[in-house]
Amino acid sequence: MTEPILKVNDLSVYYGKKKALHSVSIDFYPNEITSLIGPSGSGKSTLLRAINRMGDLNPEVTVTGSIIYNGHNIYSRRTDTVELRKEIGMVFQQPNPFPMTIYENVVYGLRLKGVKDKKILDEAVEKSLVGASIWDEVKDRLHDSAIGLSGGQQQRVCIARVLATSPKIILLDEPTSALDPISAGKIEDTLYGLKEKYTMLVVTRSMQQASRISNRTGFFLAGDLVEYGNTKEMFMNPQKQETEDYITGKFG
């Protein structure tokens, strides 16, 4: 059986005294898309941010438990968070390209690593934009501002920016919720094409999106992981009443 690429063990996250995640344990597998679903405030985005150690930036956040990646707990003192975030990249709900050219957006992480060779940078830009399914749309205007792109194009440039650092895992926090249906469909197609090379965790409020793109789905409610398993099986035959009620739209 395939070994998990990421193991979350007994993870709890607190914002001050408020417990946002309750002893969650969940494994993620290589070259799969996992959807995290649940109503607002259920803990799904909190889990994503814990995997990327974004809580480090907030003194109110306390994390207990462990997240094992490459055989090591990412919350150990030895973890280099800069290197971690290169291997576990993140794409946010609102497209957030930097106020610079499309080219410079994509190579931003490489420049931080000290890469200066133009050939290497050029190759990374093309490869990453191809991977994000936007190369043909922007190849003739790489030195135009990314801010001038449509929302869907901006989001795909943000995906390309993550791809350029050669991550193993990509975290996506509601990456299509701010986009129109056509742009959202292009993002879904892009993600589906990327799973041959990457492991992806996608927070989504769309049951249809989860059913279309993901291999596995985790349902969160009030900080608890209620159910986790094969997406088709969960949607056809949920094991918990809360899961069925959420999937069928009785609450959420």
UniProtKB/Swiss-Prot annotation:
Superkingdom field: Bacteria
InterPro entries from the UniProt entry: AAA+_ATPase, ABC_transporter-like_ATP-bd, ABC_transporter-like_CS, P-loop_NTPase, PstB-like
Binding positions for ATP per the UniProt entry: G38, P39, S40, G41, S42, G43, K44, S45
Annotated EC: 7.3.2.1
Membrane topology: Peripheral membrane protein
Catalytic reactions on record: phosphate(out) + ATP + H2O = ADP + 2 phosphate(in) + H(+)
Pfam families listed in its UniProt record: ABC_tran
Gene Ontology biological process terms from the UniProt entry: phosphate ion transmembrane transport
Annotated compartments: Cell membrane
Record keywords: ATP-binding, Cell membrane, Membrane, Nucleotide-binding, Phosphate transport, Translocase, Transport
Cellular component GO terms, alphabetical: plasma membrane
Family of the protein in this entry: Belongs to the ABC transporter superfamily. Phosphate importer (TC 3.A.1.7) family.
The protein's role, per its UniProt record: Part of the ABC transporter complex PstSACB involved in phosphate import. Responsible for energy coupling to the transport system.
PANTHER family to which the protein is assigned, alphabetical: ABC TRANSPORTER I FAMILY MEMBER 17
Name this protein carries in UniProt: Phosphate import ATP-binding protein PstB 1
